Curated annotation (Swiss-Prot):
The gene is rpmC. It comes from Mycoplasmoides gallisepticum (strain R(low / passage 15 / clone 2)). InterPro entries: Ribosomal_protein_uL29, Ribosomal_uL29, Ribosomal_uL29_CS, Ribosomal_uL29_sf. Belongs to the universal ribosomal protein uL29 family. This is Large ribosomal subunit protein uL29. Signal peptide: none annotated. The lineage of its organism: Bacteria, Bacillati, Mycoplasmatota, Mycoplasmoidales, Mycoplasmoidaceae.
Length: 153
């Protein structure tokens, strides 16, 4: 492990320090919440961090680790804030849509409940029916009618 760390450049080691500090912070947070099952990871991370910092001090590289870690954490928090703001915007949009829908439904109910005005019907003048004169039927007429309707055959 030491040989691998010593083979890395200063920039790579500095990035590794920020990553290890971030992981250590994350592990401590999970431990406090009771989500961390393997607590030995914290010890290993501290040891690796100490090795990297030792190599950097041997090379006389002055590194303000706290500033780097804080900037790394700030970037992560900014990303989380952006995600939260996007979620809030979506929630507001959904809430507005629900309100608009409720208003539309309420208006529709009002329209249905309102009495409808009576439609004016136009009176159409009807022509009086012609009365047909009915001739009284006599026996002679009945015979003629029956004769006309009988089929020949």
């Amino acid at each position: 492990m030491n040989k691998e760390l010593r083979a890395k450049t200063n920039e790579e080691l500095i990035q590794l320090v920020t990553q290890l500090k971030g992981r250590l912070l994350e592990y401590r947070f999970k431990l406090a919440q009771g989500e961390l099952d393997k607590t030995h990871i914290i010890k290993e991370t501290r040891q690796t961090l100490a090795r990297v910092l030792t190599i950097l001090t041997e090379r006389d590289v002055k590194v303000n680790v706290n500033a780097m870690v804080s900037s790394f954490v700030k970037e992560q928090t900014k990303q989380k804030e952006i995600q939260e703001s996007v979620k809030k915007i979506k929630q507001l949009r959904v809430a507005k849509l629900k309100q608009n829908k409720e208003k539309r439904l309420a208006n529709a109910e009002k329209v249905k409940a309102a009495p409808k005005p009576e439609q004016k019907t136009k009176k159409v003048k009807k022509a009086p029916k012609k009365t047909e004169t009915v001739k009284p039927t006599t026996n002679k007429n009945k015979k003629n009618v029956k004769a006309k309707t009988k089929k020949k055959g």
